[in-house]
Regions:
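An amphipathic, aromatic/His-enriched active-site/gating alpha helix that lines ligand/cofactor pockets
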Residues: 58-85
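Short beta-strand-to-loop capping motifs
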Residues: 8-10, 54-59
Length: 98
């Protein structure tokens, strides 16, 4: 499976209901699992435009797009997602350059 960085920024609704955030994190993890992925790590972030993040694995980009839309549609966070490449994957990409 591929690795992804999914960053979350609270919406006004999300920050107004911040005490419910831990339950929403668990709900988001369940959404990822239900769509064939697995959250490997969760972090809250200081000093960033983002508030929290997941490092996750997923079968493909389409699955991640579904995850982002499902989580974002709840109205508590906005998301920014990036594909991550392991050192081995990065090496494979570099070795394939012409």
């Amino acid at each position: 499976m591929a690795s992804y960085l999914m960053q979350f920024s609270f919406t006004a609704q999300g920050i107004q209901q911040i005490k419910d955030s831990p339950a929403r994190v668990e709900a988001a993890k369940q959404t990822v699992r239900a769509m064939g992925g697995e959250v490997r790590e969760f972090y809250a972030i200081l000093g960033s435009a983002h508030d929290t993040l997941f490092i996750l694995e997923a079968p493909d980009d389409a699955a991640v797009a579904r995850m982002v839309l499902a989580i974002g549609s709840r109205g508590y966070v906005r998301t920014e997602t990036h594909r991550l490449f392991t050192e081995e994957e990065y090496g494979t990409v570099i070795r394939s350059l012409p």
